[in-house]
Amino acid sequence: MSNLKLWEGRFSKSTAQIFDLFNASIMTDIKLFEYDILGSVAHVKMLAKCNIIREDEAKLIIDSLYQILEDFKLGKIVFGISDEDVHMLIEKELIKRIGEVGKKVHTARSRNDQVALDERLFCREKNLYLQELIKTLINTITTLAEENIDVIMPGFTHLQKAQPILFSHYILAYAQMLKRDLLRLRHNYSMTNSSPLGSAALAGTTFEIDRFFVASELGFESVTENSVDTVSDRDFILEMLFSLAMIQMHLSRLAEDFIIFNTDEFKFIELDDSFCSGSSIMPQKKNPDALELIRGKTGRVYADLIGLLTVLKGLPLSYNKDLQEDKEFLFDSIETVEMSLIVINEILKTLKIDKENMVNSCKSGFINATDLADYLVTKGVPFRDAHFIVGNIVKYCIESDKTLEDLSLEEYKRFCEKIQEDVYQFIKIETCVNRRKSYGGTSLESVRKQIDNLKEFLNKLK
C-alpha cells in the first residue's frame, strides 16, 4: 500500500525512481500535516452535511483523521519519498486504517485547492505568531527608551555626526518600523483569510457542496470568488514573503547600527557575552556574531521573495507543478525571521548603554551647527544667509582646532554682529535637543508622547 500512487489508474507503467525523487515534496510539505488534517475534517463534515457521504462514514473518517494526527505528533507515522506529498501520505494512511470508506475523503476536492487551503491555514497561524513577536519587540524597545529617556547621543547622516538626539528617540525609530511591519502583517492576514476549498482542480465541482460551511468551520471570513484564480493564486504567500523581507531588512539595519556602536571606535553600547562569540586565533576578540547573522540572513529572505516571484513570472493559468516550489521559500523565510525577532529581542533586553561615551561624542563634529544657524534666524538673518555664515564659522573652527563652544563672543562677531551672549545657551547640546519640540522630534516632551502613542497602539490591538 505504501508504494501505491493514488492517481495511477491512467498509467501503464510505474514512475521512474529518479522522477519519484525529483517529484516528491513530502520532506518539505510534511510541515503542513496538521493543517491538512484540519482541512480534511472540515471537508468531510461538509460532505456529510450535504448528503454526499453518510454521517456514520463521516464520523469514521474524522475519528481516524484525528487518530492519525495524534500518531503523527507521537512520531508513529513513517513517511518517505514514495509517499510523494503530505496529502497522499494522509489519504493512504486513512485508507490503510479504515478501508473503502477512506477513499471517499477526496470527494469534491483536488490537491490543487487542498494545498491552497493548507498554505492559507499555515500562513494565518504563522502571521499571528509573528505579530506577537513584533509586539514583544516593540514593548522591549519602548522599555529601553523609557529606561534611557534622557540620554543624549549624536544623530548621524551619511554615517557622519549630524545633530544631537536622544538615544530614546533613536531607538524608537525602530519601533515605528516594526509598527508598520505589524500593520502590514495584519493586512496580509485579511488577504489570506478566504477559503479556497471547493475550487477543486480549477473549474469547481459538480457536487452540491457548501463552501461557506467549510469556511466557517475553519474560521475564514469569506470564500474565494474564482476557482481558476484560486488554485493558481500565491499572492498571499508573496505578500507574506514581502512582509518578512521588510521585517528582516529593518532588523538588519538595527543590527548594523549596533555592530558599529559596539566597536571600540564608538563604545556607545556593549553587547552581552551571551550573544557574542570569540576568535579561534585572537584571544582578545568578542565578536557580534548574533547581529552579523541577522544581517547576513537578510539576503536569504530577499532571495526567497525573488525566488517565488520568478517561479510565478511566466506561469499560465491555472495550476502548474511549479507552484510546489513555494513552500521552501515560505518555510525558510518564516523560520529565519521568527528566529531573528526572538534573538534581537533578547539582545536588546541584555544591552548595556554607555551614556557617558554617547554624550561625550556630541562634543565633536559641530553637531550643534544647525542650531547656531537657527539662532541667527531668530535674530533676523534669512536662513540661507545664516547657513553660509555658520559654514564659515565651522571652517574657522576647524582651522583653529576649536569647537563652537570654544569661540569667544568677539570671534563670533567677526562673522555676524547680531550674535549676542545668549548664543552659548542656545547651542548647548541639551538645549539643542529639547528645543526640537515639533511633533515627532527629539525633545524629551516629544519622545514621551511617542512612547505614550506606541503603548496606546499596542493596547488597541489586544
From Swiss-Prot:
Protein name in the entry: Argininosuccinate lyase
Biological process terms in GO annotation: arginine biosynthetic process via ornithine; L-arginine biosynthetic process
Domain of life, source organism: Bacteria
Molecular function terms from GO: argininosuccinate lyase activity
The entry's keywords: Amino-acid biosynthesis, Arginine biosynthesis, Cytoplasm, Lyase
CDD domains: Argininosuccinate_lyase
Protein family per UniProt: Belongs to the lyase 1 family. Argininosuccinate lyase subfamily.
Gene Ontology cellular-component annotations: cytosol
Compartment(s): Cytoplasm
Main subcellular location: cytoplasm
Pathway listed: Amino-acid biosynthesis; L-arginine biosynthesis; L-arginine from L-ornithine and carbamoyl phosphate: step 3/3
Top EC group: lyase
EC number: 4.3.2.1
PANTHER family attached to this UniProt entry: ARGININOSUCCINATE LYASE
Pfam families: ASL_C2, Lyase_1
Catalytic activity, reaction form: 2-(N(omega)-L-arginino)succinate = fumarate + L-arginine
